[in-house]
A protein has these predicted regions:
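Targeting-peptide/extracellular-domain and disordered-appendage signature
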Residues: 15-216
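Bacterial N-terminal signal peptides
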Residues: 5-14
Length: 216
């Protein structure tokens, strides 16, 4: 297969600086995902140079980031398919102290998986949540590895490509190898600083790779 693929890796930060409610013994993932970030997190305020391969990985000083893949593929029989795999990281509190329990987490992860079978007019989707504790979810470098349960994004031992995407559910599965493309990196907005409004910090650092050869 060789079709269009768009890869986006970025950091998105909310502009609101309202403090979160005091910590309690329980947390609802949906409420935390919708809450304003702790004001102690770093914010996207000005243009900064990207530092690769380090910037392909996680940035726990920031509240939110994601690794986003979407593409159009054709199988050996000519059938058309579309897919999306996105892993989000959401910080609960700034800083990264050594936890006193392997189950204690300062990060939450959310995943979206979708596959469209164009010929059959069918669309399949799944969503996952997990904490960055006890090996359930997380992000690492050298090489790049972002995972949420059995869903994962893996980079090459040297550099980023080839990338390996792997995710499955009871109904669908995705297993793709992504090679480097011929087009240069695309930096959104002002040299990678993508402003969402005039409010300071309501912005993200955002870059993309497009038209990458993909097979699987």
């Amino acid at each position: 297969m060789l079709r269009l693929l768009l890869l986006i890796a970025g950091i998105a930060l909310a502009a609101c600086e309202q403090p979160m409610s005091p910590a309690s013994g329980t947390i609802r993932v949906d409420q935390r995902m919708a809450a304003a970030p702790d004001p102690g997190f770093a914010r996207a305020l000005e243009v900064r140079p990207f530092d690769f391969p380090r910037d392909h990985g996680a940035h726990p000083d920031y509240a939110t980031e994601w690794w986003y893949f979407t593409g159009n593929l054709r199988d050996a029989g000519g059938g058309l398919f579309g897919y999306q795999l996105t892993l989000f990281r959401v910080g609960l509190r700034p800083g990264d102290p050594i936890p006193d329990s392997r189950w204690r987490a300062r990060q939450l992860y959310m995943g979206h998986l979708a596959i469209s079978d164009i010929g059959a007019a069918m669309h399949y989707r799944e969503e996952r949540f997990g904490r960055a504790a006890a090996g359930l979810a997380g992000a690492a470098m050298d090489p790049l590895h972002v995972w949420l349960g059995p869903w994962s994004i893996r980079g090459a031992d040297q550099g980023l490509f080839p990338l390996r995407l792997s995710a499955w559910t009871e109904d669908i599965a995705l297993d793709l190898s992504i090679g480097p493309g011929s087009k240069p990196l695309v930096a959104q907005g002002e040299n990678g600083l993508s402003r969402k409004s005039a409010a300071p910090g309501n912005a993200s650092y955002y870059y993309s790779f497009t038209r990458l050869p993909t097979g699987g």
